[in-house]
């Protein structure tokens, strides 16, 4: 008898289906950082907050004036879990105190990456989030079976080359899908 290994979605995008009712994830595009038998972790990459890197640096170093360039670096709502914790997805040409290498991408959670970005010596491409999306064991698989999400291959151009309001549509288009034409009804064979 053949056994099947589970299929995990690490290093892929999750596209929220148009009927997603959870306000934390409606109309979101999420990069999956980790997915295994214990659960999944991802970062929502298309929800900018009304914060920028200057705001964060003012909290970290209240006695120092952040560089003017940091006013142009948006902070994204990465998900509803630990919303006071920062996560930086970035190109992999440099690493920092708390950097995890992903496939052609890195994730850093230490403050030194923020200071490097502010000083103009950080990674060439980056996206900063507060919070993350987390799923318990089997939860994401159940949501996929309920047609809450579509998954598609990761494309760094979608994260780093497009405006936040274009990312969700671009990810769907990479599958040949127009989200506005989808229905909430689905069949299972």
UniProtKB/Swiss-Prot annotation:
Record-linked Gene3D superfamilies: VC0467-like
SUPFAM superfamilies in alphabetical order: VC0467-like (SSF143456)
UniProt xrefs under InterPro entries: AlgH-like
Any one annotated GO CC term: cytosol
Domain of life of the organism encoding this protein: Bacteria
Short name of any one Pfam family annotated for the protein: DUF179
Sequence similarity: Belongs to the UPF0301 (AlgH) family.
Protein name as catalogued: UPF0301 protein PSEEN5058
């Amino acid at each position: 008898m053949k056994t099947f290994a589970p299929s995990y979605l690490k290093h892929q995008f999750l596209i929220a289906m148009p009927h997603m009712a959870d306000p934390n994830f409606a109309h979101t595009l999420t990069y999956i950082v980790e997915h295994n038998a214990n659960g999944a972790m991802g970062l929502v990459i298309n929800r900018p907050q009304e914060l920028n890197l200057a705001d964060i640096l003012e909290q970290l170093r209240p006695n120092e004036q952040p560089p003017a360039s940091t006013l142009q670096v948006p902070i994204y709502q990465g998900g509803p879990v630990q919303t006071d914790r920062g996560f930086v997805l970035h190109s992999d040409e440099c690493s920092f105190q708390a950097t995890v290498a992903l496939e052609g991408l890195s994730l850093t959670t230490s403050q030194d990456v923020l200071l490097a970005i502010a000083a103009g010596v950080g990674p060439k491409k980056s996206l900063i989030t507060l919070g993350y999306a987390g799923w318990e064991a089997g939860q994401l698989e159940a949501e996929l079976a309920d047609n809450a999400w579509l998954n598609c291959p990761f494309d760094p151009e979608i994260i780093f080359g497009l405006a936040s309001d274009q990312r969700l549509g671009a990810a769907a288009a990479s599958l040949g899908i127009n989200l506005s034409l989808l229905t909430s009804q689905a069949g299972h064979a």
